Amino acid sequence: MAKEESIEIEGVILEALPNAQFKVELENGLVVLAHVSGKIRMHYIRILPGDKVKVQISPYDISKGRITYRYK
């Protein structure tokens, strides 16, 4: 069985939660719980409420995601 590709979509940070997790409102209006990817964490990139980000979502569970990029 081949692994399903993840869905990439843009969103805006609504709220910062403990353990480097965030509530993100996606372009389609869905609100997901997202954590920070390792590369962003490694380079100490700050993510604040109101920032525009790119989120990867698994097709198996669309309520959780991973933040992969913060737009400038």
From Swiss-Prot:
<keyword id="KW-0699">rRNA-binding</keyword>
<protein>
    <recommendedName>
        <fullName>Translation initiation factor IF-1</fullName>
    </recommendedName>
</protein>
<dbReference type="InterPro" id="IPR006196">
    <property type="entry name" value="RNA-binding_domain_S1_IF1"/>
</dbReference>
<dbReference type="InterPro" id="IPR012340">
    <property type="entry name" value="NA-bd_OB-fold"/>
</dbReference>
<dbReference type="GO" id="GO:0003743">
    <property type="term" value="F:translation initiation factor activity"/>
</dbReference>
<keyword id="KW-0963">Cytoplasm</keyword>
<dbReference type="Pfam" id="PF01176">
    <property type="entry name" value="eIF-1a"/>
</dbReference>
<dbReference type="GO" id="GO:0043022">
    <property type="term" value="F:ribosome binding"/>
</dbReference>
<comment type="similarity">
    <text>Belongs to the IF-1 family.</text>
</comment>
<comment type="subunit">
    <text>Component of the 30S ribosomal translation pre-initiation complex which assembles on the 30S ribosome in the order IF-2 and IF-3, IF-1 and N-formylmethionyl-tRNA(fMet); mRNA recruitment can occur at any time during PIC assembly.</text>
</comment>
<dbReference type="InterPro" id="IPR004368">
    <property type="entry name" value="TIF_IF1"/>
</dbReference>
<dbReference type="GO" id="GO:0019843">
    <property type="term" value="F:rRNA binding"/>
</dbReference>
<keyword id="KW-0648">Protein biosynthesis</keyword>
<dbReference type="GO" id="GO:0005829">
    <property type="term" value="C:cytosol"/>
</dbReference>
<comment type="function">
    <text>One of the essential components for the initiation of protein synthesis. Stabilizes the binding of IF-2 and IF-3 on the 30S subunit to which N-formylmethionyl-tRNA(fMet) subsequently binds. Helps modulate mRNA selection, yielding the 30S pre-initiation complex (PIC). Upon addition of the 50S ribosomal subunit IF-1, IF-2 and IF-3 are released leaving the mature 70S translation initiation complex.</text>
</comment>
<keyword id="KW-0694">RNA-binding</keyword>
<keyword id="KW-0396">Initiation factor</keyword>
<dbReference type="InterPro" id="IPR003029">
    <property type="entry name" value="S1_domain"/>
</dbReference>
<feature type="domain" description="S1-like">
    <location>
        <begin position="1"/>
        <end position="72"/>
    </location>
</feature>
